[in-house]
């Protein structure tokens, strides 16, 4: 469970308004990533694929994350299944545990909703990165609940290298 300062950082981050930083960059990125995502998850309808990519770009950039790192994390967490539920109850694309809804103060949020799930996941990861003094490996392990072990971060990095980086 998060401590009080983490809880407050998360609430502050989620309350901010966010949008694309650079429209041209976003359009180029969306086209490239859409082709890659269609190869990786061909059953996702095109409109849902674009929504997933737009939300990933929007919240990753807004929270200071690499959008492709977020895509690699989503691949490892749910294999792009927005309705995925893990054996421990984590939900959606970024496998968010339901307790986060109460921590954030929005108990009625739908974690299967693409935007909600990606917004939560990006906010949580960005705070872990901040807490870990920008050590992304440790932050990824914290995100997964496997702090101190390298298996999960290495899976994310492998997906990032193989499919999401040029």
Predicted regions and their residues:
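Catalytic glycan-binding domains that act on GlcNAc-containing polysaccharides
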Residues: 7-9, 14-166
């Amino acid at each position: 469970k998060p401590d009080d300062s983490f809880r407050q950082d998360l609430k502050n981050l989620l309350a901010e308004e966010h949008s694309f930083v650079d429209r041209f960059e976003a359009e180029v990125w969306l086209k490239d990533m859409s082709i890659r995502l269609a190869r990786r998850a061909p059953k996702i309808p095109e409109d849902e694929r674009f929504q997933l990519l737009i939300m990933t770009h929007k919240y990753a950039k807004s929270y200071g994350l690499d959008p492709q790192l977020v895509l690699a994390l989503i691949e490892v967490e749910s294999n792009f299944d927005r309705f995925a539920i893990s054996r421990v109850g984590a939900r959606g694309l970024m496998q968010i545990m339901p307790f986060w809804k109460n921590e954030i103060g929005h108990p009625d949020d739908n974690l299967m909703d693409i935007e909600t799930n990606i917004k939560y996941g990006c906010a949580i990861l960005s705070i872990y990165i901040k807490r870990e003094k920008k050590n992304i490996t440790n932050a990824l392990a914290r995100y997964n609940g496997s702090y101190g072990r390298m298996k999960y971060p290495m899976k994310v990095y492998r997906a990032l290298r193989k499919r999401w980086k040029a």
